[in-house]
A protein has these predicted regions:
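N-terminal beta-strand motif that seeds the catalytic metal site of vicinal oxygen chelate
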Residues: 3-17, 203-228, 261-268
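Catalytic beta/alpha-barrel core
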Residues: 15-17, 37-45, 62-70, 83-91, ...
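C-terminal helical cap(s) of enzyme catalytic domains, especially alpha/beta-barrels
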Residues: 99-104, 185-207
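Catalytic cores of alpha/beta
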Residues: 27, 71-81, 114-122, 139, ...
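Vicinal oxygen chelate
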Residues: 251-256, 281-318
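Glycine-enriched alpha-helix->loop->beta-strand junction motifs that scaffold or abut catalytic
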Residues: 32-37, 58-62, 80-86, 101-107, ...
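Conserved, mostly hydrophobic/aromatic
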Residues: 14, 31, 78, 127, ...
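Glycine-rich phosphate-binding active-site loops on the catalytic face of alpha/beta enzymes
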Residues: 89-95, 128-138, 172-195
Length: 318
């Protein structure tokens, strides 16, 4: 898995400011306990290099990178300490060139068309957008994604638990960065349980799992329609016909022939099927790729190989 794939799957990239390198590993472990396996340790303090070294050595499951990298010297030092990716607040030709030449993942800060074009000239497809709340937030990135459709953004600055869902659901957002997950004060006070809790909530928001509908296996098209009409007669759900199934309202799908799941199926909506797949894989669940449905090149539905209480489960892209 590439560095950019790790960042995408994580969805949230904690921006970590450490005054004491001794807090680096406990902070990393708190993030991991909350389901977040990437962290950006910023070069805003003298403890940054030692902190990166400690996490790289002692927390192999954590994908650690360096942030607020302004100079080439900082960049080289960060990589030597074990940083797997570099994040810069602005665009530096010197830093970007070195990273590209040395196969180091970098997301430079780009908020103008000129900066984005400079990043593209090096083959970069993901850039940092900072400070997002100052430079127009989602509306600005949406406008930039028009002429630069191949570019994805990692906004930082003004992103928090209240607007995370709005940010992460935008198609031009690769991931989001922020310090709200592990505030400097919480690290200093060793409020690691709080950090873990915030990470769990952020991951829950980013994945956006919701029950979409329940599927019923009917014997044939006639039975499917009859079931839907009966539900409509009882509850006024309405009936909507389809190619392989009929719906009673939006909550019950009745298949026109027996399909997956002894008892039927459950559809679960998510903000991102790729992120959901990565999360499910961590917990021992796998996708049945043969059932995948696409809209263009984007997967919009796919079943899991496992059943739950006799029900098959499929993901549904929001």
């Amino acid at each position: 898995m590439t560095a950019l794939e790790r960042l995408y799957n994580a969805a949230v990239v904690p921006v970590v400011v450490l005054d004491d390198a001794a807090d680096a590993v406990p902070t990393a472990k708190a993030l991991l306990a909350g389901g977040v396996d990437v962290m950006e340790i910023t070069f805003r303090t003298a403890a940054a290099a030692d902190s990166i070294t400690a996490v790289a050595k002692e927390c192999p499951d954590m994908f650690v990178g360096a942030g607020t990298v302004i100079t080439l010297e900082q960049c080289k030092k960060a990589v030597a300490c074990g940083a797997k990716f570099i994040v810069a607040p602005g665009y530096s030709e010197e830093v970007v060139s070195w990273c590209v030449e040395n196969n180091v993942a970098i997301t430079p800060g780009c908020v103008t068309p000129t900066e984005i074009m400079a990043a593209m000239s090096h083959g970069l497809k993901v850039v940092k957008f900072f400070p997002a709340n100052v430079y127009g937030g989602l509306s600005a990135m949406k406008a930039l994604s028009g002429p630069f459709g191949g570019i994805k953004f990692i906004p930082t600055g003004g992103v928090n638990d209240k607007n995370l869902a709005e940010y992460i659901s935008a198609p031009f957002i690769h991931a989001v960065g922020g310090s709200w997950l592990c505030a400097k004060a919480d690290i200093a006070a060793h409020n690691f349980d709080k950090i873990t809790s915030l990470c769990k909530e952020a991951r829950k928001t980013a994945l956006g799992f919701e029950i979409a509908h329940v599927g019923v296996n009917a014997g044939d098209a006639e039975e499917s329609l009859a079931v839907c009409r009966a539900l409509d007669a009882a509850f006024g759900f309405g009936v909507k016909g389809g190619n392989s199934s009929n719906f009673a309202g939006s909550g019950v799908e009745v298949m026109k022939s027996p399909y997956l799941g002894k008892n039927g199926h459950i559809a679960v909506k998510t903000n991102s099927i790729p992120r959901a797949a990565a999360e499910l894989a961590k917990n021992g669940f796998t996708l049945d790729e043969s059932t995948a449905k696409y809209k263009g090149e984007k997967m919009v539905a796919v079943y899991l190989k496992q059943e739950f209480g006799g029900f098959a489960v499929h993901l549904l892209q929001k």
